[in-house]
Structure formats: C-alpha cells, structure tokens
Curated annotation (Swiss-Prot):
Protein name per its UniProtKB record: Arginine--tRNA ligase
NCBIfam families, A to Z: argS
Keywords on record: Aminoacyl-tRNA synthetase, ATP-binding, Cytoplasm, Ligase, Nucleotide-binding, Protein biosynthesis
Gene Ontology cellular component terms for the protein in this record: cytoplasm
Lineage: Bacteria, Pseudomonadati, Pseudomonadota, Alphaproteobacteria, Rickettsiales
CDD domains in the cross-refs: ArgRS_core
Length: 576
C-alpha cells in the first residue's frame, strides 16, 4: 500500500467522524519529519481543525490520536509542539510497500491529483542574437524538467519559447551582420562597442555576399534591414534550437514577438483593455533616485496594473509613441489564453525578477481572475573552470556557450547539476568537480548507485540462478528486511511518489535531484556495510532467503533511481 495516501485517507475519514468535515482535511499535509525522533510521518491536521473550530490544537490532536491509533499499520502516535501528530509506522507496513512497488509498478508511479489545467510554460526565450550561453541553461533545464514532471502526472502542457525578434538587440544584431557582410566583400571593418564582436556572425556575412553580391549596399535601408533580419533571426534560432536539442530540450512552439506587431494583436489587446476600463491617460511618479524637479511628467497611456497587485501602473507606449515592451507582453499573454491555456507559467532569469508583479497583473486582468499564473525566477549560475570564472557576454565575444560546456561534460551532467540547488538560489557549477568520480560529485554518486543495483541483479543471476529465478517469480519474504538501514531505505523508497507530488505542487524539480542523492547515499552506506560485515551484503550465497529479499530491495532501488533520472531527462547508466 501507499502509506502516505492511506494515512491521508484515514485522516480525512477521522475528520468526518470527529468534526463532520472532510473537506478541510484535504488541506492537511503528511510529511516526513526532519528528525527521526519525531516518528516516521507527521501531520498538521489538528492545527487546521483547531483554527476552524476555535479549539486548542492539542485537544484536537488527542481526539485524532484516539481514532487513528487503532489502525493496523500504526505502531504509535505522539503529539508534539503546538499540535503536530507524529506517527510511527509498523515495520511490516513499510515492508509491504516494497511488495506493492514490485507488484503494482505502474500504479505506484502514478499520482492522483487535480489535472484539470491546460498549462502553458514559457522558458528560455533568449534573444536570438548568438549561441546560447550557459547562463540560460539553468532556466532551460528548470523549465524543461518542470514541464516533463507536469506531463508525467497527466497535465496537458505546451512548452513555449518567446522569440524576442522585435527589440533593440535585434537592431544591433542586424547592424553587426551588415558589417560582417561588408567584411565578406573585402572591406576592413571595426565592430563598435555595443554590437556583437563574436566570430559566429562571420558566416552570415559570407552567405549574404554570395547571394546578393554588393547589391545590399545600394538597397534602401528598410528593404536591406528586412533581408538581413530575416536571415539573422532564422540562423540564430536554428543555432539556439540545436543548442537546446543537445541538452535534450525541445519546445512545442517558437512564438515570434514580431508577429504580434504584424497581425495587429497589440492594438486589439489595448482596445479590449480599454473596453474593460483598464487603460487611461496619466503620468507616472519620478523613478527612484531621480530628483523630482528634474523629472518631466509626460501624459501617456497607462495600464491599471496596480488594480492587480503591481507597485505602479505600466506605460503601454514609449516616448516616441511606439508600443512598449509591456504592450507586447499584454498581447502575448492574451494570445496564450485565446489558445486555451488556463494556467500560465513563466520561467525568467534573475535579471527579470522585477517583472513578476507586472506579469501577474497582466494575466489576472486578461484572464479575468480565471487563469492561474506563476512566475518562477532562476538565479545566476557561477560558472568556473579550474577555479577561474568564465565571462559570459555575447557583446564581448567571450562566453561559455551551452555547446562548449556540453562538449566538455555532456547533457546529463548539465541537466542534473542545474537541479542541485533550488531555482531561486545561486548555483555554483565547477567543470572539474562534475567530472570527478567521488561521493562529492552528486551526479556520479547517483549514477553509480544505479550501476551497482544493476550489477547486484546481474551477479545474482550468475552466482545464484535458482535464487534469481525465485526472485523474478516473486518468491521472497520481505519481513527479512528488518535492519535499521533496510527500513530507512524502504521508508525513502515509499516516499518517491510523495516527492514527485511535492515537485509538482511547488514547481520545485530540484526535490527530485535531492531525493536521488539521498537515496544513493543510503544505498552506498549499506553497500559499504557489506564490505565490513558479510551479513549486510545483498548477495549471501549461503542464505538464499535473505538474498531473495535483498534482491527485491535492490530491484526497487534501481527502478526508483531510473524513474527519477528519466523524469529529469537524464539517461540512467548501466555500466561505468
């Protein structure tokens, strides 16, 4: 049985029995206490009921204890702190969890949660101005793994890349390619500061020179701009797609910002918001740091962003009368909603943390409070090689590209390491350490655990074929898995789907990497105990019954590690 789910259902039933209220129990949590002294599982149900019924939490907890302590899988119940109910589960119930995983593998890896959402998740959305640098890899991996997890548990998910092909950086890209075109024609050039000096744009100049000769030089500015922009954006997007594909990332949609202008979508969105009374003409206060007397108050069209929790209303026009970036963000969000999305997730870099409130305001307004929105920020990656920081700047022409790092360490290492810290915390990525074969290298440690579990099963088939066949037929006595180390591993295995569920609930894929590292650590510890004491070995040739039970344990460890690696897009290794 799934102990977490069973306890939750029993708490809901007890809530109905004691307080005629099972709905409130659905909000209660079932967690694994950080300190094993507090039992195996803990719930906050008493505090939730107490708040609703205006009763002391400990009084509520004691009533729940009277009902729940009679359950056959409960060994004991203790009340802690302000009213936490701590449960100790009987060993045989944990052992039964292993049998449940082996006999109902597909069902075990399913999660029963509300899936009535059509989710659009936008991530990466890097300006198509050059090869993708490693700084974008974190958001790319985070967004991709989050999408994979959501899809795994049954959500409808659209993975989207917003192509910023209408901004000033595209103008700079076109200017740089024009210079490379002139260079291809034999002209001596100098790339001014502010443009893109990297050699990756040289081939674009050569393509243009072969196709047009010197015709572009005499062409009018508007026509020439369109030709160069079309080629440059296409080639840079091809480059970015390949960089992402090499990381195992594939978006469903690449959405052009320019298309919003070309199709008049911004005008349509503004008219809609005007009809809703959300656009007005007004002035904004002086920005922080500006002397009030020096600030020129300009009447402009503003969106009532403060109606939805933003710190100030947002201009939808620039000083020259053209649409602001915010205006295109409005139209883009409307397009997503019009396509049927009822939950928008934006994955942004640390440099866009100031956009959170305004994006939330956009979606709340256009979705009329019926569309969910989550904005997740990925903090910076401190990327070093041999202790020396690597500069990451397209404009300087020197940066660690995704392609370069991929060639050095491979996509699996990049994907795993980008999940070794919570997304909103800075991450250190050391190229040397990620290639070490030591316990200090988390990806190696997890993969090595998977390899070892596979080797246990292979060795058993070779040394004890009769026992191995009995294991495959399900002839094992799991009550023999009774050591403290074995029970601790089983508890962790039983918590796998709970970990996956939490990753979905809180949009925190790093929980999976943390879980795998923890599981690998406990497995390796037991393996090492076997080196010191033969009674702890997984294969004991003179004890077939215990070997059968431990083969079952090794098999489940292997399946869970493989499932965890696969859901984050990392291929489980079979040999090293």
């Amino acid at each position: 049985m799934n102990i977490f789910n069973q306890l939750k259902q029993d708490i809901i039933a007890a809530s109905q029995q004691l307080y005629n209220n099972q709905e409130i129990a659905n909000t209660a949590t079932i967690e694994t206490p950080k300190d094993s002294f507090n039992g195996d599982l803990s719930s906050n149900i008493a505090m939730i009921i107490a708040s609703k019924e205006s009763i002391a939490p400990r009084e509520v907890a004691l009533k729940f204890k009277e009902v729940l302590v009679t359950l056959p899988y409960i060994a004991s119940i203790e009340i802690a702190g302000p009213g936490f109910i701590n449960f100790t589960i009987k060993a045989e119930s944990w052992q039964a969890a292993i049998k449940d995983i082996l006999q109902h593998e597909e069902k075990f890896f399913e999660i029963d949660i509300d899936k009535n959402s059509n989710i659009n998740i936008e991530y990466v959305s890097a300006n198509p101005t050059g090869p993708m640098h490693i700084g974008h890899a974190r958001g790319a991996v985070y967004g991709d793994v989050l999408a994979r997890i959501l899809q795994k548990v049954g959500y409808s998910v659209t993975k989207e890349y917003y192509v910023n092909d209408a901004g000033s950086q595209i103008n700079d890209l076109v200017s740089t390619v024009l210079l490379r075109y002139k260079e291809a024609l034999g002209e001596q050039i100098t790339i001014p500061i502010g443009l893109y000096p990297g050699e990756y744009l040289i081939p674009l100049g050569e393509i243009l020179s072969k196709e047009y000769g010197n015709k572009l030089l005499t062409m009018n500015d508007v026509e020439r701009f369109k030709i160069i922009k079309s080629l440059a954006v296409e080639k840079m997007l091809d480059l970015n797609r390949k960089d992402l594909a090499d990381l195992g990332i594939k978006h469903d949609i690449f959405f052009s910002e320019q298309s919003l202008y070309d199709k008049g979508e911004i005008e349509k969105t503004v008219k809609l918001l005007e009809s809703m009374g959300l656009i007005y003409e007004g002035t904004l206060p002086a920005p922080k740091g500006k002397v009030h007397e020096d600030w020129k108050h300009k009447v402009q069209k503003l969106f009532k962003s403060t109606n939805y929790g933003d710190s100030q209303d947002r201009p939808i026009e620039k000083a020259d009368g053209s649409w602001s970036y915010f205006a295109s963000d409005l139209a883009y969000a409307k397009d997503k909603i019009d396509r049927g999305a009822n939950h928008l997730i934006y994955v942004l870099g640390a440099d866009h943390s100031g956009y959170v409130k305004r994006i939330e305001a956009i979606v709340k307004a256009l979705g009329q409070e019926k569309v969910k929105v989550d904005v997740k920020i990925c903090q910076l990656v401190n990327f070093v090689e041999n202790g020396v920081p690597v500069k990451m700047s397209k404009r300087l022409g020197s940066f660690a590209s995704v392609q370069d790092v991929n060639k050095k360490v491979g996509k699996d290492i990049i994907r795993f390491m980008m999940l070794t810290r919570q997304n909103d915390k800075p991450l250190d990525f050391d190229l040397v350490k990620v290639k070490e074969q030591s316990r200090e290298n988390p990806i190696f440690y997890v993969q090595y655990a998977h390899v070892r579990t596979k080797s246990i099963l292979s060795k058993a088939r070779e040394l004890m074929p009769e026992a191995y066949n009995s294991f495959k037929e399900g002839k094992y006595n799991l009550s023999l898995l009774s050591t403290e180390e074995e029970i601790e591993i089983i508890k962790l295995l039983a918590a796998w789907t709970k970990t996956l569920e939490a990753s979905v609930k809180y949009f925190e894929p790093h929980r999976i990497a943390f879980y795998l590292i923890n599981l690998a650590s406990k497995f390796h510890s037991m393996w090492n105990f076997g080196k010191e004491n033969s009674d702890y070995r997984f294969i004991i040739e003179n004890n077939q019954e215990l070997t059968l039970a431990r083969l079952a344990l090794a098999s489940v460890i292997q399946k869970v590690i493989a499932s965890g690696l696969e859901v984050i897009g990392v291929e489980p290794m079979v040999t090293m």
